[in-house]
Regions:
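A beta-strand edge to alpha-helix "cap/lid" segment located at domain peripheries
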Residues: 1-9, 58-154
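Short, low-complexity N-terminal intrinsically disordered segments enriched in polar/charged residues
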Residues: 1-39, 149-154
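A solvent-exposed, acidic/Ser-Thr-rich amphipathic alpha-helical stretch
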Residues: 13-16, 30-84
Length: 154
């Protein structure tokens, strides 16, 4: 299964890949998201190590059961050959109603078919009030006219 754009990445392809990942994650559909990764993809997400699509699906199912009303924005930081680095922020609340903005960086490595083979994510959670939220679009894809991270001063 091929998942264009394929490496080596230029600036346009890297931005497209980041937006595709953002859109998939904003769908909050673990099975759909997992298809962007190799069968044996290796992840480090915070302090958790995950291997393979089944592990990714299980992880994302747990994540989105806990991180409610999730909204994510990604932005390319750097790219070279088959690697892309992104920074991101996402907003969510827990089951008590406490809102958070989570900030992070991801390093991605892709195979020749454009599937992500390696993902390293470092993430920090900042408690915020509901009034501090910046991501207000309806569930799903961020609208094209919604500001990105740099536009929001994040």
């Amino acid at each position: 299964m091929s998942r264009p754009p394929l490496p080596p990445f230029d600036a346009v392809a890297a931005a497209q890949k980041a937006r595709m990942a953002e859109d998939a994650w904003n769908s909050r559909d673990p099975a759909k998201v997992a298809l962007a990764y190799t069968e044996d993809s290796r992840w480090r997400n915070r302090a958790e190590f995950i291997t393979g699509r089944a592990g990714i699906e299980a992880f994302l199912t747990r994540k989105w059961a806990r991180e409610l009303d999730y909204r994510l924005i990604k932005e390319v930081w750097a790219f070279a050959a088959n690697h892309i680095a992104v920074r991101f922020a996402y907003e969510w609340h827990d089951d008590s109603g406490q809102w958070f903005r989570s900030y992070g960086n991801e390093n991605w490595e892709f195979d020749d078919e454009g599937l992500m083979a390696v993902r390293h994510a470092s993430i920090n959670d900042l408690p915020i009030t509901e009034a501090d939220r910046l991501f207000h679009w309806p569930p799903g894809r961020r609208p094209d006219d919604h500001p990105g991270l740099s536009d929001l001063g994040l």
